[in-house]
Amino acid sequence: LDTIKDDIVFWSAGSKPLELVKSGEVSMALAYNGRVGAAILSEGENFEYMWHGQVLEQEYICLTSGSPNRDEALAWMIHASSPESQALQAKYIPYGPMRASGIDLINAGEPFFHTGVNIMPHMPNTPDRLEISTVGDPVWWSDNGAEINERFSAWMGS
């Protein structure tokens, strides 16, 4: 990293990567795919995705022991994790559903995006993109995150 440090622009707000590319300050950026998709699909921007090597995150829905309104919470969890609910968010933002059956529903319903365009080219977890992706390891980060963050912060300050 030392060899490229002077050429890196760090950002702390999700809108910043696209602003940096648009302004010409940088030629490429790491950005949230939902923001890139919104810029392309809703604002007509001319960005392109580079999916190779993307890092997919795992998200969890849990119900803790002794939670109040357990039955209602469980009903919501079942609803939220259904293929239909997972697919529905893609009508408005190209975040991939956590279930492959949700991707199947989107694909079968194209054009799926609320503006009437195809959303599948903007989805991060199509089968072909999964082949060139890596999945983050939450256990590794739990075990090593504090040390890595400390080392990275020290490097940033050097």
Which functions belong to the PLM regions below?
Residues C62-T64, A75, V135-W140:
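Active-site rim elements
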Residues L1-D2, L18, K22, L30, ...:
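Non-transmembrane alpha-helical segments in soluble domains
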Residues L1-I4, E43-S67, P111-F112:
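Periplasmic-binding protein-like
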Residues L1-M50:
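Ligand-binding pocket segment of bilobal, Venus flytrap-like solute-binding proteins
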Residues N125-S158:
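Conserved C-terminal helix/tail region of periplasmic/extracytoplasmic solute-binding proteins
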Residues V9-A13, M28, V55, T64-N69, ...:
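Extracytoplasmic/periplasmic, Sec-exported soluble proteins
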Residues I4-I8, E25, I40-E43, A80-E84, ...:
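Sec/Tat-exported extracytoplasmic proteins
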Residues V55, T64-L130:
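Mature extracytoplasmic/periplasmic domains
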